[in-house]
């Protein structure tokens, strides 16, 4: 039997105080547990594959700060590098050698990137790349996909995923129609709809931006031929193809989704992993396109803390760790064991589920599946997911508090962690 015995008294007290200080008591909406019920747990510390809350409860973590913690939380080599960097200062507001080092690592790894610009978040990266798409092509319209999330900038809050989907918001108040009027949307994995948009708006579309593997509407991989088709359509129409690899970059392979699937876009956005747990973002691509960016060209973009030495240091050390032999084989093995076990246990308990993984990224829907699109994801049983989430929390497993978020493993997850997670799932899934 499931019992609600988790002691979260201190978390509740802190969250109650936070609600008087911050909108909804959080700094980012999905953290509020709105879609799964109950109140959020407040973290005290993290280490490896585990997190501890302020009440002393320990959890196996499959959120990983929403993706960055691919090597595990508080990796000793990353911490050592950061401590050394701290002695030199936290921010320069000027060029530093560390930018060159991380830039070279990114350029060497990501097939599309010949030149890169560092920023402070994935949202910044996507805002900047949209401006660059328009500046380079001289066109204003952009195609995005339903359920794909590219940050909270006005022009992207159209049929967006992540927190927008989690809270059930149609889009967002405060976004003028004049801003979103040039944002066209298509169902993910639907090439016909993309071709139709190009036919309806000839010579007006600057490009197509997408999560090559969707992680902000749950885990939704591309159908066979989808990415290839987008590459062909954009080339035929003189438009740019942009992969938003803020989530997939350095996670599903060292060179991201574009390396994994063998499709090279014109531009790429990055974040999460390349900051090693510190705030970071980046965008890059073909040299002729990136030459438009100031001060090399006329398209303006800037940032006070961009390229700061701490984020660069953490990113460099994280990528060094990921380059070691067997890294992605380990992620694939551990994640495969996790998701195959969850699916089997759920089905044996009588639940209709579907899901999958690519290396360190995974997802499961309470739906017969397969899930190809945002509409498919929305048809999954959200109420059952909420019960599953709470039950797993009671059993010491921390999952993303939304069915519209992918899960993540790290190099710190062990077979014992996976076994414990699956044992917890047996208890929970037998009782919901």
Curated annotation (Swiss-Prot):
Q: Which CDD domains match?
A: OAT_like (cd00610)
**UniProt EC number:** 5.4.3.8
Q: What class of enzyme is it?
A: isomerase
Chemical reaction(s) catalysed: (S)-4-amino-5-oxopentanoate = 5-aminolevulinate
Please verify whether the record's keywords include Isomerase. yes
Subcellular location(s) of the protein: Cytoplasm
Is-annotated flag, keyword Iron-sulfur? no
Name the major location.
cytoplasm
Give TM segment ranges: none
Q: Which GO terms describe its molecular function?
A: glutamate-1-semialdehyde 2,1-aminomutase activity; pyridoxal phosphate binding; transaminase activity
Q: Give coiled-coil spans as residue ranges.
A: none
Task: Mark the residues carrying the PTM N6-(pyridoxal phosphate)lysine.
Answer: 272
Name the family: Belongs to the class-III pyridoxal-phosphate-dependent aminotransferase family. HemL subfamily.
| Stated name of the protein | Glutamate-1-semialdehyde 2,1-aminomutase
Lineage per the UniProt record: Bacteria, Bacillati, Cyanobacteriota, Cyanophyceae, Acaryochloridales
Q: Which gene encodes it?
A: hemL
């Amino acid at each position: 039997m499931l019992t609600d015995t988790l002691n979260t008294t201190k978390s509740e007290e802190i969250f109650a105080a936070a609600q008087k200080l911050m909108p909804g008591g959080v700094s980012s909406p999905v953290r509020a547990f709105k879609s799964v019920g109950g109140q959020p747990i407040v973290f005290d510390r993290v280490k490896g594959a585990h997190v501890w809350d302020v009440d002393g409860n320990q959890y196996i973590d499959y959120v990983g700060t929403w993706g960055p913690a691919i090597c595990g939380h508080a990796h000793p080599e990353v911490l050592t590098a950061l401590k050394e960097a701290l002695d030199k200062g936290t921010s320069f507001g000027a060029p530093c050698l560390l930018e060159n080092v991380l830039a070279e690592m990114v350029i060497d790894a990501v097939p599309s990137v010949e030149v890169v610009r560092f920023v402070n978040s994935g949202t910044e990266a996507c805002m900047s790349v949209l401006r660059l798409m328009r500046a380079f092509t001289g066109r204003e319209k952009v195609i995005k996909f339903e359920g794909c999330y590219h940050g909270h900038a006005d022009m992207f809050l159209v049929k967006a995923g992540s927190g927008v989907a989690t809270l059930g918001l149609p889009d967002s108040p405060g976004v003028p129609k004049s801003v979103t009027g040039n944002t066209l949307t298509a169902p993910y994995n639907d090439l016909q709809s993309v071709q139709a948009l190009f036919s309806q708006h000839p010579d007006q579309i600057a490009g197509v931006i997408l999560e090559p593997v969707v992680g902000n509407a749950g885990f939704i991989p591309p159908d066979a031929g989808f990415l290839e088709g987008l590459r062909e359509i954009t080339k035929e129409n003189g438009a740019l193809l942009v992969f938003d690899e803020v989530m997939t970059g350095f996670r599903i392979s060292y060179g991201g989704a574009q390396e994994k699937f063998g499709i090279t876009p014109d531009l790429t956005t990055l974040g999460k992993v390349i900051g090693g747990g510190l705030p970071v973002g980046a965008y890059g691509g073909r040299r002729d396109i990136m030459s438009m960016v100031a001060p090399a060209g006329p398209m303006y973009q800037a940032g006070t803390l961009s390229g700061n030495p701490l984020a660069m240091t953490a990113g460099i050390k994280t990528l060094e760790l990921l380059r070691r032999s067997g890294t992605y084989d380990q992620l694939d093995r551990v994640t495969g064991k996790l998701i195959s076990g969850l699916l089997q246990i759920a089905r044996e308990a009588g639940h209709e589920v579907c899901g999958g993984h690519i290396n360190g990224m995974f997802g499961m829907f309470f739906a017969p599946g397969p899930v190809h699109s945002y509409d498919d994801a929305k048809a999954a049983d959200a109420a059952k997911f909420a019960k599953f989430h709470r039950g797993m929390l009671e059993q010491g497993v921390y999952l993303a508090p939304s069915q519209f978020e992918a899960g993540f493993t790290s190099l710190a997850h062990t077979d014992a962690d996976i076994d414990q997670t699956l044992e917890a799932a047996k208890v929970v899934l037998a009782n919901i």
